[in-house]
């Protein structure tokens, strides 16, 4: 039996739309074993316990590519990454499936090749890249090639995920975006993403409130998220260095200095009085990315 651990991710970082992502200390685990026949999946909703399951689909894509003849599979999922909340749950299933299949075929794929296959399934690389490589990643897809690099951000920060009790699909979140943007709005974002990356590396935190501003996606997506503006104000009032929409939402991500232990307590109080139920979870950067945890004797 194979055990795979994949971190959740937060993409976009405000102005870094579709180009930045970070792996965080929230995980999905997948246990996989080959059996004589059939597909058996547990640990997820009934509607995902079939051959349309994203983890299984991702494994099969690798098997088909290499002509691996699969008998049957038993898959168990232990997930802490909430679904459709902007924390990379789909990316974790894709990366986990590709990595598991790679182990089955004798590790014929490099991480770069796993990134290519995962991006082909996901459609864009900003979540799958950090899920594979760990850390904060800048990534660009140009034609058939994916360019990426790790960003060594200052270690003196924590991430706080504000997670609501409602979901928001990526499809719906993309539908509200305009087909074109003003030139001045593009310039607005370019300047801020450069300042944001530089400040996260240098630790010049006073720049971050401005550097996390965005005009390309958050102004449109926030209309789908109850309490959004109120939460941004509350996070900043309680010491957040920067606040941004995690992925397509609806999770909101706040960054604080590590010594600000009061942020978690204060925000828990703030969240209690909102008209939607929100939870807050403190996270740190995961620098390892997806890993094969163990190969165990015996079944699931």
From Swiss-Prot:
Can the keyword Glycosyltransferase be found in this entry's annotation?
no
SUPFAM superfamilies, alphabetically?
GHMP Kinase, C-terminal domain, Ribosomal protein S5 domain 2-like
One GO term of the biological process aspect: threonine biosynthetic process
Sites binding ATP sit at 82-92
A single Gene Ontology MF term assigned here is:
ATP binding
Q: Which reaction does it catalyse?
A: L-homoserine + ATP = O-phospho-L-homoserine + ADP + H(+)
Any one cellular-component term (Gene Ontology): cytoplasm
> What keyword terms does UniProt attach to this protein?
Amino-acid biosynthesis, ATP-binding, Cytoplasm, Kinase, Nucleotide-binding, Threonine biosynthesis, Transferase
This protein's pathway reads: Amino-acid biosynthesis; L-threonine biosynthesis; L-threonine from L-aspartate: step 4/5
* Record-listed E.C. numbers: 2.7.1.39
- State a single Pfam family of this protein: GHMP_kinases_N
Record-linked PROSITE patterns = GHMP_KINASES_ATP (PS00627)
Keyword Amino-acid biosynthesis present in the record's keywords: the answer is yes
Family of this protein: Belongs to the GHMP kinase family. Homoserine kinase subfamily.
Described purpose of this protein according to its UniProt entry: Catalyzes the ATP-dependent phosphorylation of L-homoserine to L-homoserine phosphate.
What name has this protein been given in UniProt? Answer: Homoserine kinase
Starting at the broadest rank, the lineage of the source organism is: Bacteria, Bacillati, Bacillota, Clostridia, Eubacteriales
């Amino acid at each position: 039996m194979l055990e795979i651990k994949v971190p959740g991710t937060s993409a976009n970082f405000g102005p870094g739309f579709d180009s930045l992502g970070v792996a965080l200390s929230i995980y999905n685990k997948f246990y996989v074993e080959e059996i004589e026949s059939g597909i058996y999946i547990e640990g997820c909703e009934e509607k995902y316990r079939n051959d349309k399951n994203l983890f299984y689909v991702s494994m099969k894509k690798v098997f088909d590519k290499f002509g691996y003849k699969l008998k049957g599979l038993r898959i168990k999922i232990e997930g802490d990454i909430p679904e459709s909340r902007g924390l990379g749950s789909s990316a974790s299933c894709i990366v986990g499936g590709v990595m598991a299949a790679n182990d089955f075929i004798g590790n014929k794929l490099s991480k770069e090749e796993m990134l290519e296959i995962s991006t082909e399934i996901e459609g864009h690389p900003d979540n799958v890249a950090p899920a594979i490589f760990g850390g904060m990643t800048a990534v660009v897809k140009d034609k058939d090639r994916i360019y990426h690099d790790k960003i060594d951000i200052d270690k003196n920060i924590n991430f706080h995920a504000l997670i609501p009790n409602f979901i928001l699909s990526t499809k719906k979140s993309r539908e509200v975006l305009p087909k074109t943007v003003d030139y001045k709005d593009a310039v607005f974002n370019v300047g801020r993403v450069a300042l944001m990356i530089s400040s996260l590396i240098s630790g010049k935190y006073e720049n971050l409130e401005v550097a996390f501003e965005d005009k390309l996606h958050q102004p449109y997506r926030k209309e789908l998220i109850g309490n959004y503006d109120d939460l941004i104000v509350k996070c900043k009032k309680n010491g957040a260095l920067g606040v941004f929409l995690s992925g397509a939402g609806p999770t909101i991500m706040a960054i604080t200095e590590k010594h600000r232990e009061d942020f978690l307590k204060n925000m828990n109080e703030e969240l209690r009085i909102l008209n939607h139920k929100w939870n807050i979870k403190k996270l740190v950067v995961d620098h390892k990315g997806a890993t094969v945890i163990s190969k165990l004797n015996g079944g699931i």
